[in-house]
Regions:
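N-terminal loops that bind phosphate or other acidic moieties
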Residues: 1-186
């Protein structure tokens, strides 16, 4: 079994950046999108939105459950619960996108050891995503710079994983057959 959470909605990368910033005490400007198509005013609005969300949660940075409550994000709350339940069941989770990865980090703060069950499907250019992957010490399977979330990178990574498993299975079968043939000759 392998679970791939995805998120869908507006403002989720801002929510992820605010959660990450509050949890790690990272400045909002270091978490705002680096998209070169943004104007200075758009980038400033992004920083302001992250800052305002972080301010709302400012007293909760040391307590991850309180941080989730203060954030008011049902999507983040659901994703953290999803990751925690998967970990309790010892089921690997292929996190994809900024919010899912940040929620994996929040889950790690709630239940240390969670990271052992987390795998990163891909790395987006979002600063909060990059930093969350680093904090979790994950190695992304793909580097597509996808910003869509929604599990898209997870599905693509799953295809790559299935192909790798097939290749390894074929190699193991061939080696086993060769060993068996050699044993039959002796």
């Amino acid at each position: 079994d392998l679970l791939i959470p995805g998120e869908l909605g507006e403002g989720l990368s801002t929510e992820a950046a605010a959660l990450f910033g509050t949890l790690t005490k990272t400045e909002p400007a270091a978490l705002a999108s680096l998209d070169t198509s943004l104007t200075t005013q758009q980038w400033q609005r992004d920083v302001t939105a992250i800052r305002d969300r972080m301010f709302r949660c400012r007293t909760a940075h040391a307590e991850p459950l309180e941080l989730l409550t203060e954030s008011g994000s049902p999507v983040a709350q659901a994703l953290v619960g999803f990751v925690l339940q998967a970990t309790a069941r010892r089921t690997p989770v292929l996190v994809d996108g900024c919010l899912a990865t940040v929620c994996g980090l929040v889950a790690e703060k709630i239940a240390p050891g969670t990271r052992a069950w987390l795998y990163s499907s891909q790395l987006s250019p979002e600063p909060a995503h990059i930093q969350a992957v680093q904090k979790l010490e994950l190695t992304p399977l793909l580097a597509f710079d996808l910003t869509t979330g929604q599990g898209t990178g997870g599905v693509l990574a799953l295809s790559a994983l299935n192909a790798a498993i097939e290749l390894v299975s074929d190699e193991v079968y061939a080696i086993t057959e060769a060993i068996n043939a050699q044993n039959d000759d002796t």
